Each structure stands twice: as C-alpha cells, then as structure tokens.
Amino acid sequence: MKMLTRLQILMLALFSKGFLLSLGDHNFMRREIKIEGDLVLGGLFPINEKGTGTEECGRINEDRGIQRLEAMLFAIDEINKDNYLLPGVKLGVHILDTCSRDTYALEQSLEFVRASLTKVDEAEYMCPDGSYAIQENIPLLIAGVIGGSYSSVSIQVANLLRLFQIPQISYASTSAKLSDKSRYDYFARTVPPDFYQAKAMAEILRFFNWTYVSTVASEGDYGETGIEAFEQEARLRNICIATAEKVGRSNIRKSYDSVIRELLQKPNARVVVLFMRSDDSRELIAAANRVNASFTWVASDGWGAQESIVKGSEHVAYGAITLELASHPVRQFDRYFQSLNPYNNHRNPWFRDFWEQKFQCSLQNKRNHRQVCDKHLAIDSSNYEQESKIMFVVNAVYAMAHALHKMQRTLCPNTTKLCDAMKILDGKKLYKEYLLKINFTAPFNPNKGADSIVKFDTFGDGMGRYNVFNLQQTGGKYSYLKVGHWAETLSLDVDSIHWSRNSVPTSQCSDPCAPNEMKNMQPGDVCCWICIPCEPYEYLVDEFTCMDCGPGQWPTADLSGCYNLPEDYIKWEDAWAIGPVTIACLGFLCTCIVITVFIKHNNTPLVKASGRELCYILLFGVSLSYCMTFFFIAKPSPVICALRRLGLGTSFAICYSALLTKTNCIARIFDGVKNGAQRPKFISPSSQVFICLGLILVQIVMVSVWLILETPGTRRYTLPEKRETVILKCNVKDSSMLISLTYDVVLVILCTVYAFKTRKCPENFNEAKFIGFTMYTTCIIWLAFLPIFYVTSSDYRVQTTTMCISVSLSGFVVLGCLFAPKVHIVLFQPQKNVVTHRLHLNRFSVSGTATTYSQSSASTYVPTVCNGREVLDSTTSSL
C-alpha cells in the first residue's frame, strides 16, 4: 500500500512540474469554478476558443462554452433541489476550461486527479505525539467528470482518468475511437459515435446521387476518425473521394485558403463533406468567402445549426446540408439562462467576459475603448438561441447523478446521506455496475416516447439519432430549417430544401450518360466513366451493360427491355403489290380470252392444226403462272409457302413441257422425212398429252420430295444492316428456290434447241418459228431476272416484285408469240382458217399432188419438199 502511495506521489510530482511549467509559459490567468459538496463532479468545457499563434486560449465561446457550462450548473442546482434524486446528498462541481485544445485540457485535468494523489490515509501518517497529520488545501475529491466537448480532448482526458478509475461522461465527443472499451474503459457519452453520423451523411449523398465529392477534416480524433468512418460508408455506396484535405492545428488563415484552392482543382466535385470542429468550419467558410467559392456543403454536427459559423459568409454557405444530434430544447434552461447577468452570476468567472463580448461593451470604464454596458441589457429571445447540445449536457449530469443515487441506495441502505462506504468512491464499481446500467426518462423532455429514454449501450454510447438542417434565406435573413432526420434510415423533405442555384446540384466525376448510353468505367475508379452509345438494337441491362435484343426484337423507348418487332411483308394495298397484281390480272384476262376463243373455235382447222390438247395444257400453265403472283404477294404462311414452292416450278414445267412436246414432235417428223423414215411414233394427240404429262410429273415428284425433306413454313428474317425490320418470309433460301427451277431450265434449254433446229421448216410449219421466238425471249427474260433477283436480295419488296413481273412476262411471251397470231386469224382473218391441198412455198418446189396420210386424223398430211426432200405438213394455211 505504501509503495502504491509513493508511486502516486511520484506521478503527481511529475505531472505537477509539467503543469506549473506550462502555466508559467503563458500570460493567461487560470480560472475555475469550485463549489463544494458531498460528492463533486468535474466539468470540462471549451469556454474559450482555440488561440492563435502562441496563445493557448482565444475569444469566449458563447454557445458551446458558456451555455454548456451554465447547463451543468443548472442541472446541479435542479438535482440538489430534487427530493427523490440523491436526497440528503449535495453535489458540488469543479469546472475547468479546455480552451478547445487537447493538450491544454490534459493540463487542466490534472486538477481532477490531484485529490487522488494527495489524499493521505490518516491511519498511516501520525505525528510523534500520536495525533493525526494536518492536511491543508486539500483538492476536491472528484466522483466523476462531465466532458469534454471535442473528441480529441475527451481522448486525452480519458487516458488520464482511467489511471485513477474516475468515470467520465461526455456530452459532445463522438469519435468512434471512444467506443473501444479496451482503451477507454471508464468513458461513456450521451451522444452516439460518429460512425452513425458518417452513415447518415453517406446516405444523404447517395440520396442525391452525389457520387464524387471532396472531404475536409479537422486534425484530431473527431475529424480524422469521423472522415475515416465516412469514407468507409462512402465506399459501400460507390461514392468516390475526389480530394481529401485536412486542416491542422495551426489555425493559420493560409492553411484554410490552401484547402479552398485544392477543392477548386476538382470542378466536378461540387459537394464538399466536412467533418470539422466548429472553429475550423467557420475559418474554412470564411476562406471560401474570400475567393467567392461556391460549393454545396454537407457538414457534421461540428457545424450543426450554429449561426456563428456562417456569420458574414452566409451567401457561400447558402444551401448547406448540416447534421445535428436529435435533441429537444430545455425550456427551463432558457428561463434560467435569460435570468443571468453579471450582477447576479458571481460563480461563473467567465461570465463577465461573455457579457462584454456578446453586447460589445465594457463593464469597466474605458476598457478596450468600448462604451460602458447598459445596466438594462439582458439576454432574451432576440439575442439568444439555445445551443443544440444543452440537452446532452443536462442528461450527462443526470446520468452521473442516477448512477450515484443507485450506488448510494445500495451501499448506504439505511441513510439518505453518504455513509463511510461512499466516502472513498470505487470508480470501477460506479462505472461498471451502475453507470452503464442506468435507464431513465430525460428530464425536462416534453416528449415521453422512446426518444426520451437516456441509457448507454455496452460500449457506453448513446443512441444514434440526427436531425438534418438546411441553411436557407427567408425574407433576407439566413436561418437553419429542419428538413429531415436520420434514425437507422434517412427521411428527407426534399421539397423544403433550398439550393444555391435553385436546383439540386450535381457532383459526379463524369456527366450522366444519355438514356441510350452505357457507362464504361475507368480502371480503378468506380465514379468516373466514359459514355458509350448503345447500338440501336441494344437495350440497357444496367447502367454499365448494353445487350443485343436479338433478331426480330427492338429495344423499348426507355431501353429497359425489348419487344417483338411487327412482321413486315407486302400488303395488298402497297404499291409494290398493286403493279404485279395488275399485270397478273391483265395476263389472266388475256389467257381467259384465248381459252374462250379456242373453245368457241375448237373445231376450226387452225385450232385443230395447233394441237388443241397441248394448247389447252399450255394455257393452263400460263394461267397458273399468273396465279403465282397472288401467292407471292399474299402474307406468308405454311400453306402459302407450300403453294409457292409447288406452283412456281410446276407452272413453268407445264408450259415448257407442252412446248417441248410440240417442238420434239415437229423435229422428229422432219428428221424422219429427211432420213426417209416412215411416220414417227407417238405423234398422235393422246401420245403427246401423255408425254407432256410425264414431263410435268417429273417436276411434281421433285417438288413433292423437296416439300417432304424441307417442311414448308415461315421465318422471321432480319437483315444485319436493317435490324429494325423483321421480314416474314418462307423458310426456304433464295438459292433453294432457284435450284428447284433447275428442271424447268432444262426444259427451256431443250425447247430452245428444238426450236432452233426446226427454224427452217416449211411455211406451214412456221409455228416452230413462233415457238423459237417464245423460247429466245424467255431466255432473255430469265437471264435478266437472275442477276436482279440476287442483287435485290436485301430488299424483299423489290425481289418479290421482280419475281412476279418476270413470271407474268413469261406468260405474256407465250400468249404473244404463240397464241396472239392464231387468235388474230381466227377473229380477224377467218378466210385463212381453211384447209389447203397444196402448200405455197417461197423457196421450196412442189414435187407432186397432195396425198393424205390419214383422212380421219385431226390433221391432214401431204407430201411436200423441204430442202429437196419430201416431208409431211399440215393442211392449214401459213400463219
């Protein structure tokens, strides 16, 4: 025990030496408030602001200093008058000034531990005569400490007080470091740690989509740990820090000007987050005012709702969003504080300086060349507004009182006064067993809900609740308006917020992308991007990804998804359809006229000599070719597609099979005559019909196999260069369609060959010449059609129209070259539609009278000479 006492005395000597030396270095009169009591509470308040240069202390801190100090005195008075809380026990105080500096606060706090070091156990020290040692100027024994205000101050003081097991309750220190019970195991606070505030600030930035911001922090635990917590919360929300600045303790104007210059180097970071002490915030706003720099400030409770911070610089702070711990005004304190004046407040040694500073007057004549203070000056609603943390100061004092009350009830059950067990307090027991377990309704709170409960969590922290304020101008006066609150979640009244430029500011590294653009993030930076337009056929999966809608689909107007494009095909009312349909109808009408004429004159020599059966088959094929136009114009469907594939090749096969049968018959007849052979076989009408049908059947079989192997159907086709158009087509390739005409091409070639071979037949066989003209013209049409068909493959309208017109032209060629001359003779030259017994040849000589091979056949054959040989010929006149 003696060893421990000597160690404490040695520590006191060391501390006292440093303390006295430090006081000797400064011309600053040490002031304090000492009020004796049964139990004494220490108090630490930033009564003076931080000094400049070599000065420790500056001007009087009117709100955070004087008001908070008086709030503690007010709470002590109320507790001492309370008959239920610590009845019979008088609380005293020992209040010191921290001058807003942690080092100065540590020096001052040595006063609190002096009593623990200098208290001498009377039983151990006795005089030679047996009397006890006399102790003079004994320091007040501190039961607990209320304070400090700044986190850096509380951290320094807590490190000292824990050595002597003195509990400490702060009313304003919010550094997250103070939640570490392994280091600050005698510290508690009525305010929440800063990581709640940091989370609230980050949620405000995310709410307004401010993803690229600058930060400024005060040097010290409050600013540094607060901004560190904010940066962690910002990263979780993909918010980037453009530049992170720090204001040192030098309090030099140049340092603040330098910070503003650095902030201006990031023009896209229009929002600046401040985690600063009040005096640092005021100096920074003043520096911004000097260069007329405009930012949107988002500030912590170090700024809060203090008008003194923006005084004289309101226009550069206009629109600022600030946070303040959720609290209610203590109306009883208002009445108490407004009743104070220098003439009735003698226990506060700083109150006279406060009065002179507030009213800009002097309580002594000719002091600082100020006018003498009017004795009628008073604190009232026109010059006073309650500081935001008064409630927390009162709650801190009451929390300590409740803990002492429970301890006194436990240790001294039979008395309302202090018993011997409490004369030497066990600080550890007071903190662990009583202080951390207090739970009471806040005094002077008009609301009796959950928000009025005062208690500590396991880390000694208060509950996290914040009000959100907006600096506004109303009627030429600047004031803070509450626009929201945060308690686990953010709630904002956006419509009531005023902005410096009348609209929500933007603070982003890159400009927002257009609705049709995606963000291409830059490596290592989640807030800077390059906007890349999506392709017209792409939609936005998210703001970073464009995705192809796929063939046949197109993005919606807002690019949030895709929809199926309407199918495009030729409509009957389209100009692309009207032309081919008109031509086909005209051709079909002409075909009907020819058929009608042939049927009406079915038994005339000309019709008989033309080979009626093959002519009717040929006319049917021509009619079918005209019908193909309607199939190609109609909306594609499985049935229509089957008819297209079946009808196109078959219609041509019918036409060219009939023509091939005719030309083959003529060629065989004349080849037989030239070779001196007898009448060729299979030249009768029925034989020719069967031959023709056989040739047609080959095409039908081929097409049928094709239809079986490749089932007809439709497909939605999109050209790569025209993704916005979906064409409804048959599920057959253009090349397959043309390959299916291979057999027809063979028929055309054979017809052309036979027509060429029989081109020099006698006049009465000049039908072969007309067949030749037909085939030559058909070849020209198809030779022109094929390149056009392939070249126009990108435009299905042109391709389809070309196909229809080409098919119709083939029909017109047959009608014009083969049937038009016959119809003309039948209708307009009937005198030529007779039987002749001798042929009149221009360059061929007749060798004998006509002799009929068969009188009963459809044609009468006579011997004539063709190129000097006797041949068979029909009996009709030349066409």
Swiss-Prot record:
Domain of life: Eukaryota
Extracellular face residues: 23-576, 635-645, 710-734, 793-802
Coiled coil: none
Keywords: Cell membrane, Disulfide bond, G-protein coupled receptor, Glycoprotein, Membrane, Receptor, Signal, Transducer, Transmembrane, Transmembrane helix
Function: G-protein coupled receptor for glutamate. Ligand binding causes a conformation change that triggers signaling via guanine nucleotide-binding proteins (G proteins) and modulates the activity of down-stream effectors. Signaling inhibits adenylate cyclase activity.
Gene name per UniProt: Grm3
Keyword RNA-binding listed: no
Protein name: Metabotropic glutamate receptor 3
Disulfide bonds, paired cysteine numbers: C57-C99, C240-C527, C361-C373, C412-C419, C509-C528, C513-C531, C534-C546, C549-C562
